[in-house]
Regions:
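Conserved active-site alpha-helix within GNAT-family acetyltransferase domains
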Residues: 117, 123-157
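Short amphipathic alpha-helix that is part of the acyltransferase structural core
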Residues: 5-47, 64, 161-163, 170-195
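A conserved beta-strand-loop-helix scaffold within acyl/acetyltransferase catalytic domains
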Residues: 47-59, 65, 71-82, 86-88
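Conserved acetyl-CoA-binding loop-helix of GNAT-fold acetyltransferases
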Residues: 96-111, 121
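Short active-site oxyanion
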Residues: 20, 113-119
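Short hydrophobic/aromatic beta-strand or adjacent loop that forms the aromatic wall/cage
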Residues: 58-60, 158-165
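A short, internal acetyl-CoA/4′-phosphopantetheine-binding micro-motif in the GNAT/acyltransferase core
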Residues: 88-95, 124-125
Length: 195
């Protein structure tokens, strides 16, 4: 598990470059915003403000290469049993180097350390998450609170992101399969069509 006080160093590219995963601090806000908002400008992620990242900075992990931030991701709690992996961004020049995978592994380890039963994400790349043990689920099966960010998204009425879920506790998996909101922390939302 990632310690809030010490980083987790990993060697990538055959040992040529040192990567460090650590909890984000206030000094990381500007580079986090740069990463996230570069993708937001392409319509791939929701834009974030300095206030939002400041408010949620404890949710974030960052990954550094040669002292420079090359990736970030956050674990946001919704219920005592489920959290969302969000704001996952990797610098363009560092894609396909395992940074996204390492961030997901670190965030999942952090979720397990908090005894969460499951984590979910909204994504355009479900294949990547599938390789990390996530399964596609219906959006309406996720916690109602997860939709608060969706309300400000320009694609809210015609969302094309895929919901994915990774179960960390097999007992939770049984509850999830039976769609029992009382035990699973999930809420079934009705499907509303636009006319």
């Amino acid at each position: 598990m990632i310690s809030a006080l010490t980083g987790d160093s990993i060697a990538e590219y055959g040992g040529r470059r040192e990567f460090t995963v650590r909890k984000a601090g206030m000094h990381d806000i500007a580079p986090i915003l740069d990463l996230i908002n570069a993708y937001a400008a392409k319509g791939i992620m929701l834009p974030r403000t300095e206030f939002e990242v400041s408010e949620d900075i404890r949710d974030f992990l960052v990954i550094l290469a040669d002292g420079r931030m090359v990736g970030c991701g956050a674990l946001h709690f919704y219920t005592p049993s489920i959290g969302e992996i969000r704001s996952l961004a990797v610098a363009e020049e560092h894609k396909t180097h395992g940074i996204g995978r390492r961030l997901i592994e670190s965030l999942v380890a952090e979720a397990a350390g908090f005894a969460l039963h499951a984590v979910f994400a909204f994504t355009y790349v479900p294949g990547f998450f599938s390789k990390m043990g996530f399964q596609e689920v219906e959006r309406g099966e996720l916690p109602l609170k997860a939709w608060k960010d969706c309300l400000r998204c320009p694609k809210f009425q015609c969302c094309d992101e895929i919901a994915v879920l990774r179960v960390l506790d097999s007992a939770y998996c049984r509850d999830f399969q039976h769609h029992d909101p009382e035990h699973s922390g999930l809420v079934q939302l009705p499907v509303v069509g636009i006319k």
